[in-house]
Amino acid sequence: MKYMISFAGKSKPSSEEEIITKKYLRRLSNIIINQCEVKTKNIELRLKEEGSKLLKLTPSNGKLILLDEQGTNFSSNELAEIVSDWENSNFSTINFVIGGAYGNGKEIKEKADKTLALGRLTWPHQMVKMMVAEQIYRIDTILKGHPYHK
């Protein structure tokens, strides 16, 4: 299984969160980070453009998990089970998508295969990328029976 973390907005590569994210990325050879940036000031148009760009990053034989505060709170084991089911159904890629500063537009919410919340709190992009990278690593270790997840 290949993994992607795709996000809308700018990245601050020197932040502590980015350093930790890279630590998990080094442990996984099958992960790609994608960034898309939309500069329009109109919020409605921005949500639509960001959603469209982020949707295009998910391959046709892939699945999209949208990070959204109104999503479902899955446990790590539940996420690992979802990933395992998709892998057994011959889906090759899972794209974890993080919306922009104004959240996610209607189109991407409707097209997401799963919507995941990291609790009810709002988190900065850098921290969400770090948490998603860690969860991907955790899922990978759960599926391989590695003792990282206890």
Model feature map: region roles:
Residues 1-25:
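N-terminal beta1-alpha1 ligand-phosphate binding loop
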Residues 2, 91-97:
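Loop/turn-to-beta-strand initiation segments
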Residues 10, 69-72, 100-103:
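Short glycine-rich anion-binding loops that position phosphate/pyrophosphate groups of nucleotides
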Residues 15-17, 75-77, 105-108, 127:
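Short glycine-/acidic-enriched loop or helix-start segments at secondary-structure transitions
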Residues 18-22, 51-52, 106:
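Short, surface-exposed alpha-helical segments at coil->helix boundaries
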Residues 30-93:
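S-adenosyl-L-methionine/SAH cofactor-binding core of RNA-modifying enzymes
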Residues 99-100, 111:
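Proline/glycine-rich low-complexity loops and linkers
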Residues 107-150:
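Structured adenosyl-cofactor binding patch, chiefly the S-adenosyl-L-methionine
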